[in-house]
């Protein structure tokens, strides 16, 4: 691994040593986006000189192995994978029942009886020895983490395998924890970002119960000033002008997610694409109603129901996701997509519908001209 202790500024033609080590020719990272990013998307982005990523946080180890292998078959360049490091949800049957009762009208209209209980539909990397074994076997160039940090033994094993490690921070305290844990870079996620907020679990003692909601620009400046690791900006960045702005603030690269959803290589369905191209893209909401953790998506009826005044607190993450997915599946069977989780950032209306390689090339031209 290169020395990444001094983030510096990324200027035209001068990439940070970490990006050079990864073989990147552009300071652009495609966000992992579990359920939307595909091997085809990640490979196309990497082949274009940026860094593609797979979102494997909700995938079992065998599926992760297959996706990594499929990506490697499509590119000889570096790519990354992302995993979730949330604390397992403590069983709370009373909270689950209250949440299901609140969602009962949506189940009724779908012709469903609310389930008797909710399940933790996927686990955490913290307790996933099989996933660690897959990573050590396949050795992707980058492994990044959301919702917290892996265990020290996991970090050591991955580093010994020559893997570059990154984690998401939404506050200065989280960034300091990432630095103290010995990781190689920080992904600074502003409040504008689509999908799940990467906040550390409160029980880790790193973060406060209240989300400070820092925007990307402010967060990047804070982390560049008060940490020594390279900072990758994430949240609301949709074009080369946005990338240039983040580099000017001291970030070494920019991570874009929503910008890639309309690419034909993404797994986004027709309804998701239509909403992203429609008026609804101007109205994203940060809500815990879908999964149990705060996440930004295009407003829909499930979000409206979940965020009603006086509504109970959603079931714990990812147990609330169990209810949301059942509702979405039933509604989709009727061609009703108003309960689906269409994650998107605040810059969603700026999305362009282009093949991934063409989008990366356009971003590079815009960056050069900015």
Name every feature range the model reports, one short phrase each.
Residues 2-226, 363:
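Active-site entrance/lid segments in N-terminal catalytic domains of soluble metabolic enzymes
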Residues 104, 196-232, 237-370:
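Conserved active-site-proximal phosphate/metal-binding subdomains
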């Amino acid at each position: 691994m290169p020395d990444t202790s001094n983030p510096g500024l990324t200027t035209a033609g001068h990439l940070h040593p970490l990006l050079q080590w990864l073989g990147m020719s552009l300071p652009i990272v495609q966000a992992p986006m579990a359920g939307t990013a595909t091997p085809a998307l990640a490979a196309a982005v990497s082949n274009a000189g940026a860094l593609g990523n797979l979102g494997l946080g909700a995938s079992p180890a065998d599926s992760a192995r297959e996706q990594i292998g499929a990506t490697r078959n499509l590119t000889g360049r570096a790519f990354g994978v992302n995993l979730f490091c949330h604390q397992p949800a403590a069983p709370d049957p009373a909270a689950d029942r209250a949440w299901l009762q609140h969602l009962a009208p949506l189940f009724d209209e779908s012709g469903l009886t609310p389930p008797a209980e909710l399940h933790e539909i996927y686990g955490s990397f913290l307790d996933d020895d099989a996933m660690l074994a897959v990573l050590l076997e396949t050795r992707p160039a980058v492994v990044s983490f959301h919702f917290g940090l892996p265990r020290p033994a996991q970090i050591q094993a991955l580093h010994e395998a020559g893997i570059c490690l990154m984690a998401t921070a939404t506050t200065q305290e989280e960034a300091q924890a990432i630095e103290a844990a010995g990781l190689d870079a920080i992904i600074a996620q502003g409040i504008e970002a689509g999908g799940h907020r990467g906040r550390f679990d409160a029980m880790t003692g790193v973060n406060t119960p209240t989300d400070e909601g820092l925007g990307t620009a402010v967060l990047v400046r804070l982390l560049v000033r008060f940490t020594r690791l390279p900072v990758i900006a994430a949240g609301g960045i949709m074009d080369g002008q946005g990338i240039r702005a983040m580099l000017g603030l001291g970030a070494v690269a920019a991570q874009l997610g929503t910008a890639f959803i309309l690419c034909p290589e993404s797994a986004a369905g027709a309804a998701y694409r239509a909403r992203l191209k429609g008026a609804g893209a101007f109205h994203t909401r940060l809500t815990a109603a879908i999964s149990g953790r705060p996440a930004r998506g295009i407003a829909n009826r499930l979000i409206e129901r979940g965020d009603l005044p006086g509504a109970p607190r959603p079931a714990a993450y990812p147990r609330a996701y169990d209810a949301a997915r059942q509702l979405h599946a039933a509604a989709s069977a009727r061609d009703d997509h108003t309960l689906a989780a269409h994650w998107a950032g605040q810059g969603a209306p700026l999305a362009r519908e282009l093949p991934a390689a063409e989008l990366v090339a356009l971003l590079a031209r815009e960056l050069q001209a900015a």
